[in-house]
Amino acid sequence: MKTLRHALIASSILAASAVTGAVAASAAPVLGLTGDKTLVMFDTAKPEVTKTMDVTGVTKLVGIDFRPGNKTVIGVTADHAIVSINLETGAATEVAKMDKMLTMTEAPVVVDFNPMADRLRFMTGTTNHRVHPDTGAVTVDGTLAFEEGDMHKGETPNIVSAAYTNSIGKPEKTAMYNIDATIGALIQQTKPNDGTLKAIGKLGLKDKPATYAFDIQGEEGGKNTAYLAAGKMLYTVNLETGAATEVGTISGVETDVRDIAVLPAM
């Protein structure tokens, strides 16, 4: 039986051979989180699930991401443990436990790495935490709020997913983008530690999905491609306008995709 890692490699090769060179160069494998702790694998160019795996050693994952600093897949559990996930076996190994708790409700929880600082951004509602992934030390950053001059100034943001650009190695610069479910728009977190937000533009989705999962694929040369899994549909998102363009239905999943992590192209 193929392991998840082997399936990721095979899927990426197949997708690359099925499309033109320009698209093939940026085709990459994606991990999706469904249910409480199930990982699914598909490709950015062909969103058909080719492998599923339950993560062992945890009860529930609230989010996942790829950590560029050490090239591992990281998950965060509902009890604030940071775990490393072995893609060969599905086993989760605790790396650290956060020393400050994030009040969790039914609202989505944001889990994403700042590749430049090698710190984990951990947010829900308007609460904005920055976490050392090896020690669990939490810095409580500024409350999320739209900045002065933004058309949504004074409104309560509803940030449900986030991602950083240039997530490859340790870049010299990065930028953070979010999805606001109330507005249905792409938002830039202009000063991530301060929590300041600026609306970029509407996604333009026909129907409001139950879940939003967002990540940005960084490549050598500074190219960044944003992907949004809205329910069971995969889109690319223009980081300059916010407009979403349909890639295709994520086939082979039983429930909506709650989070995604784009892995380096193999």
Residue spans for each PLM region:
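Short loop/turn segments that connect beta-strands within beta-propeller blades
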Residues: T44-P47, N86-G90, H132-G136, K191-D194, ...
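Conserved beta-propeller blade signature
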Residues: P29-L33, T72-G75, D118-F122, H129, ...
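Gram-negative bacterial Sec-dependent N-terminal signal peptides
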Residues: M1-A27
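Structural signature of eukaryotic scaffold interfaces centered on beta-propeller domains
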Residues: G63-K71, L102-D118, G154-E172, P209-G222, ...
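A short beta-strand motif characteristic of beta-propeller blades
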Residues: E48-T56, A91-L102, V140-H152, T196-K206, ...
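An edge-strand/N-cap motif at the start of beta-rich repeat modules
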Residues: S26-A45
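Loop/turn residues immediately N-terminal
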Residues: D36-V40, K71, D79-V83, T126-N128, ...
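Blade-level signature of beta-propeller repeat domains, shared across WD40, Kelch, NHL, RCC1
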Residues: A243-M266
